[in-house]
Amino acid sequence: MLVFSKFLTRTEPFMIHLFILAMFVMIYKFFPGGFENNFSVANPDKKASWIDCIYFGVTTHSTVGFGDILPKTTGAKLCTIAHIVTVFFIVLTL
């Protein structure tokens, strides 16, 4: 039982990060107006897909931020700021 308890305490922070990442990816994908209208993608001719939303979420969540997908609208910028602040406080508390 002690081994399972240690496993759970080690995987819990990972699961929290995974849940927050999944939540923000869903927000980015179903953002009012669509991902294409709220975020500028490096190739504007290509329709944004789930992979683009996941990619943007992971680069924002990991604080890498390559800059090839950028929030254009005020709402998208505020959502991205909320994602960054959420991750910042999660990292501080875990």
Swiss-Prot record:
Alphabetized GO MF terms: channel activity
Glycosylation: residue positions: N38
Membrane topology recorded in Swiss-Prot or TrEMBL: Multi-pass membrane protein
Chief place of localization: membrane
Entry's transmembrane regions: 14-34, 74-94
Subcellular location(s) of the protein: Membrane
GO cellular component: host cell membrane; membrane
GO terms, biological process: monoatomic ion transmembrane transport; potassium ion transport
UniProt keywords, alphabetically: Glycoprotein, Ion channel, Ion transport, Membrane, Transmembrane, Transmembrane helix, Transport, Viral ion channel
Similarity comment text for this entry: Belongs to the two pore domain potassium channel (TC 1.A.1.12) family.
Record function comment: Potassium-selective channel essential in the virus replication cycle. May be involved in preventing multiple infections (Potential).
Entry protein name: Potassium channel protein kcv
